Design a protein with these regions (language model features):
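Phosphate-binding chemistry for phosphorylated carbohydrates and sugar-nucleotides
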Residues: 1-167, 180
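Catalytic-core signal marking the mid-to-C-terminal active-site face
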Residues: 167-260
Length: 260
């Protein structure tokens, strides 16, 4: 990454760049971004970029030290593409785990969106079938299909710099319109995740929460792909509301005897 930014004339600093074969993502990278936040603020930098071990993910830190997630990146570059007539089908591809606030922000900008299962392979599959140019995940897997069929962290960081320079705005201002909703996620270990998720009483509880939230939030209940877990997630205007509705659904799962 440093060689790319140096070649483009940026003043570049690098941290956590001394691998020894054992320290991959050790208090570093996109999964441990706190050190980068501190470094950006203490050194008065314009922006910071955090990559994961294989550099297919990228998260940003704005000049104030705030984390700019994959959802923010999709919003910022989706709007930029729309402004330049490059947003094919007027659609940004996301996954079901993108924050509710992202969809509210897209609605305000007149940008359409699609939701896929979690996983960048599902994002790209939808993009390829439907001719979409940008898609990704909250975690920072961002796909620009004009250039690649998978996430590329360095490409993502360059695209963010492109918008900052073109619009002459700091990262904080570019990310500001997207208001991230509070989220509560609870993992329930169960004996049979499919049966638990499809139980009529559980589905009725989920439906009741969805109706109560209306257009102020959302509930998502899904099974883990790798563990015997059912994940119950609610996003709403405040944390207490999230917790209340998550607890309601979790209690139904437990009352039906699925919880371990």
């Amino acid at each position: 990454a440093k060689s790319v930014f140096d070649a483009l004339g940026a003043d570049t600093y690098v941290i956590n760049n001394k691998p020894n074969g054992l320290n991959i993502n050790n208090n570093a990278g996109s999964t441990h971004i706190e050190g980068l936040q501190k470094f950006v603020v203490e050194n008065g930098l314009d922006v910071g970029f955090a990559f994961d071990g294989d550099a297919d993910r990228c998260l940003c830190v704005d000049e104030k030290g705030n984390v700019v997630t994959g959802d923010h990146i999709l919003y910022i570059y989706g709007c930029y593409m729309k402004e330049h007539g490059e947003l094919m089908n007027n659609t940004v591809v996301t996954t079901v785990m993108s924050n509710f606030g992202l969809y509210k922000a897209f609605d305000e900008q007149g940008i359409g969106y699609a939701k896929t299962a979690v996983g960048d392979k599902y994002v790209y599959e939808y993009m390829a079938k439907n001719g979409c140019r940008i898609g990704g995940e909250q975690s920072g897997h961002i796909i620009f299909s004009k250039y690649a069929s998978t996430g590329d962290g360095i490409l993502t960081s360059l695209k963010m710099m492109e918008v900052m320079l073109a619009k002459k705005l700091p990262m904080s201002k570019l990310a500001e319109p997207l208001k991230i909703y509070p989220q509560v996620l609870e993992n329930v270990r169960v004996t049979d995740k499919k049966a638990a998720q499809n139980d009529p009483a559980v589905q009725e509880a989920v439906k009741a929460v969805a109706e109560a939230l209306g257009d102020t939030g959302r509930i998502l209940v899904r099974e883990s792909g790798t563990e015997p877990l059912v994940r119950v997630m609610v996003e709403a205007p405040d944390h207490d509301t999230c917790q209340k509705y998550v607890s309601q659904v979790v209690e139904v799962i437990k009352s039906k005897g699925y919880a371990v």
